[in-house]
């Protein structure tokens, strides 16, 4: 008998706001414990347009993640206010946890992608980034794997890949707009997308 899959940190990009309900249905269908890290989406985009300091912008953007997190929680998803491995589909409301530790630079080079990677590091969990793109591209070609830690593609924030390599994490970037890809990624099966895994 196969052992249950370990908990997984899943960042749901803010661009997938319209996909929250079907994504939650897939998470529950697959049955793997998932800790959702919400993206900032439109909330963070608004902050970018304001003339505020880096520190103010940082915390305002994280507050935006929190708002998206509450939206996810409103669909019957338990909310977590501290870093903890989930036993079911759970959404992290990250503001308090991040204020307490303040682990990442206050810069637009660090957004919810790297924050999700930090959560995965703290919990010793793998990471799945669900976005509205197929994965990470280089010279217009979809990369099945990232092997260069200095790569700074448009699909993730500038600090993300280096952070993953520095901390030996395993991360996938997969489109959240294809149900079957999401299922396969949750089951650790081969899937269209990009693997970032410096351990192999």
Question: Over which residues does each language-model region extend?
Answer:
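C-terminal catalytic "cap/lid" subdomain
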Residues: 1-200
């Amino acid at each position: 008998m196969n052992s249950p899959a370990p908990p997984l940190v899943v960042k749901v990009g803010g661009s997938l706001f319209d996909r929250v309900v079907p994504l939650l249905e897939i998470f529950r269908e697959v049955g793997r414990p998932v800790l959702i890290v919400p993206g900032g989406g439109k909330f963070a985009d608004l902050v970018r347009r304001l003339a505020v300091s880096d520190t103010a912008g940082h915390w305002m953007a994280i507050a935006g993640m929190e708002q998206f997190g509450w939206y996810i929680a409103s669909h019957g998803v338990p909310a977590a206010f501290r870093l903890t491995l989930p036993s079911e589909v759970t959404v992290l409301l990250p503001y308090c946890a991040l204020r307490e530790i303040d682990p990442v630079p206050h810069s637009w080079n660090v957004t919810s992608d790297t924050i999700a990677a930090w959560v995965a590091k703290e919990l010793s969990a793998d990471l799945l980034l669900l976005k509205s793109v197929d994965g990470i591209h280089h010279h217009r070609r979809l990369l099945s794997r990232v092997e260069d830690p200095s790569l700074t593609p448009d699909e993730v924030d500038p600090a993300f890949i280096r952070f993953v390599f520095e901390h030996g994490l395993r991360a996938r970037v997969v489109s959240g707009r294809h149900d079957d890809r999401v299922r396969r990624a949750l089951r650790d099966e081969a899937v269209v997308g990009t693997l970032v895994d410096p351990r192999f």
